Amino acid sequence: MRQDDFAIDNCLKCSICNAACPVFSVNSKYPGPKHLGPELERLRLEGVAADSGWLEYCLGCHRCDLACPHGVGVSEMIANAKARHRKPFVRALRDWWFARPGLLGKLTTILPAISNYALSMKLARFFMSKLMRIAPQRVFPAYTRPNLRTPASHQSAERQHVLFFPGCFVRYNQPDLGRKVIELLDRNGFSVEVASTGCCGVPAIANGDVAQARAMARANVRVLAEGIEAGMCIVTACSSCGYMLKTAFGGVLEDDKKFAEAADTIARNTLDVGELLVGQLQAGRLNTDFKATNLRLAYHAPCHQKSQGMGRPWFHLLRQLPGVTIEDLDAGCCGMSGTYGFKQEKYNVSMAVGQQLFDCINTSEPQMVATECATCQMQIEHGTNVKAMHPVEIMLQAYDVQKPAMQDR
């Protein structure tokens, strides 16, 4: 990613980015995004070795970017600096793997039952904490042999076709969620094709491997551009994947004109599943054959969802379900930030950041928390013992299964 050298001159030194930073609020030693971003960037541009070990503690939540009144790309400056920062060997090796969840998924799903058993063992977690600096308190999500396929049914010319970008978690951990996305869109008149894409690249950026993120972006752009040329829009069910496709592809590919133009086209043609369905709701085309239910929900908006500037589509959709009461928690970052919360040296920071959210959930006493981000779900369940689910699952469960999909009537 290339940051405009003059962007630092737009910094007013107002410190509003520090006020918005979740880590700054819980760790008095953390210098904050203003210092790690534009202040040190002035020295970096002069060739001064000014990188700090604190760079690694940036969550990558982009709250600093949203807060900045002058649009300074603070998080991008930090991400670029993080990519140049040298780490101890053990952390570098761990972060190399964390930057490649697709590769990790392929290896663990060769024999998923054995992989899951090994990763769940306390002894294995102990050795991972000693050898790889992975927090022993964390439990890895179960891996499943990838079996998400484009359904043969309902691929008719009359339906609007969309290209589903599944992401690594759906592909290797929750393919059932991917099938539910397809079923939900099917019930609302869409034909869904599953994209043959890899990792979006967010974990690579988060772990300081911008070069790997660039390679991932190029591979994905080739596939997604073909879908757009075929007249499809792209839909995502993961807030981080959606952020990458809409916002960050252009940043990591801006030095390559051909790919940068394609990335811009992809950004303009990408929607979250919730955005797509809110559009149907506003047009009066949403399938509202919902059965009455008695469910008390709390909704948590992930940071990467907020960074897309699309409002809260899932909060509005879940409010349409009869018998459902839902509270928008608006309690800040959960602190997990993908692989961040798995790192031993960051576990306590991760939990401290999430404490405000945990307290709000415990006060609200919902039966369930709805949130689009898989690692937000993991953190919420880890910090509160309250079940967290993707809104797709909740909305799909609300349909009257006796009634057919919209365009089959």
PLM regions with names:
Residues 1-3, 28-50, 309-316, 351:
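Short, charged low-complexity linear segments at domain edges
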Residues 16-41, 57-84, 244, 373-375, ...:
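Iron-sulfur cluster-binding cysteine motifs and their immediate structural context
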Residues 46-49, 63, 96-100:
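A ubiquitous short alpha-helical element
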